[in-house]
Amino acid sequence: MNAASSHEPQGRDARPAGPGSSMDGGNSIRAVALGASTGAVEALLRLLPGLPANYPLPLLIVVHLPVDAESTLATLLASRCRIAVKEAEDKEPIRPGVAYLAPANYHLLVEPDFHLSLSSDEPVLFSRPSIDVLFESAADAYGSGLAGIVLT
């Protein structure tokens, strides 16, 4: 991320409108970034199935799992949730009401145009995917419209 460039879209209509968004300049939450350690999978299995089918915000999720573990978490959550749950794909547009999980061994980032990006850059603080990488990029894109949750 280049410090010289602004990651904040310019102008009143620069951000997509929709559920959870505010076109009047308010600080409405428009996305939720969620980070979890391996031990917090049980909490995710309780939290996400409790969301209603019409949950209006995108959920951007990083779970620290062992590098050699094949992740079936997205499939497991999808079978238990009323919202859509999927592994994030590179360059995928972020949609309301969808939970995106970082694929195993990839950093998950939010681009300024509200698309997802996957990176195989070096681990950050021994982790890939890294909660820090997701939170920093999502905060750059959403600003005060981002809520962050860390489960331990």
Model-identified regions with their sequence ranges:
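Conserved acid/base catalytic micro-environments in cytosolic active-site loops
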Residues: M1-T152
